[in-house]
């Protein structure tokens, strides 16, 4: 079973737990979201695999995951970016935020660290993780999220607004 890090509202570690159990009980845990932009300022989105146990086949930011216990957060973000999207690039943490969202029968309650990177080219996504991908203009993405929120994971709108208003 995959263990993830439980935290308080200041991101202090308070323990670990099994990922599914934490999502079932809606406990606050550490996560990260990665936003990779190309030189045209477009954001790389991924469509989550239909096999994901929540928010399957929905569009999200470039990569989002949970760091493993006792590992460096930035290194974990780079590791997952390579595993999911086949991309290696420098990442910089730009902000963090807490959000809570119902996702089917589960609850995402995360202290989310947002990282930004730059990459030009095509990703080589892991088909077990990613159903599709695309580069998008931020203004067009904002409009589409407002028009078609059901196509996107709930945390994308929150994170995007925080990124644009930082």
What does each model-identified segment do?
Residues 1-33, 39:
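Acidic, metal-coordinating catalytic segment for phosphate/diphosphate chemistry
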Residues 18-20, 57, 69, 95-98, ...:
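Nudix hydrolase/Nudix homology domain
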Residues 21-32, 42-79, 83:
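Conserved Nudix-box catalytic region and its N-terminal flanking loop in Nudix hydrolases
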Residues 87-96:
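A short coil-to-beta-strand element that immediately follows conserved catalytic motifs
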């Amino acid at each position: 079973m995959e263990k993830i890090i439980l935290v308080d509202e200041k991101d202090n570690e308070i323990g670990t737990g099994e990922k599914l159990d934490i999502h079932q009980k809606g406990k606050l845990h550490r996560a990260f979201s990665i936003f990779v932009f190309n030189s045209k300022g477009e954001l790389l989105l991924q469509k989550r695999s239909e096999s994901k146990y929540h928010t399957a086949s929905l569009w999200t930011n470039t990569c989002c995951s949970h760091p493993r216990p006792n590992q460096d957060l930035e290194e974990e973000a780079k590791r997952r970016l390579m595993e999911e999207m086949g991309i290696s690039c420098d990442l910089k943490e730009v902000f963090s935020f807490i959000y809570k969202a119902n996702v089917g029968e589960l609850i995402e309650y995360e202290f989310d660290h947002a990282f930004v990177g730059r990459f030009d080219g095509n990703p080589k996504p892991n088909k077990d993780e990613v159903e599709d991908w695309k580069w998008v203009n931020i203004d067009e993405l904002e409009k589409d999220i407002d028009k078609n929120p059901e196509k996107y994971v709930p945390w994308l709108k929150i994170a995007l607004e925080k990124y644009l208003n930082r």
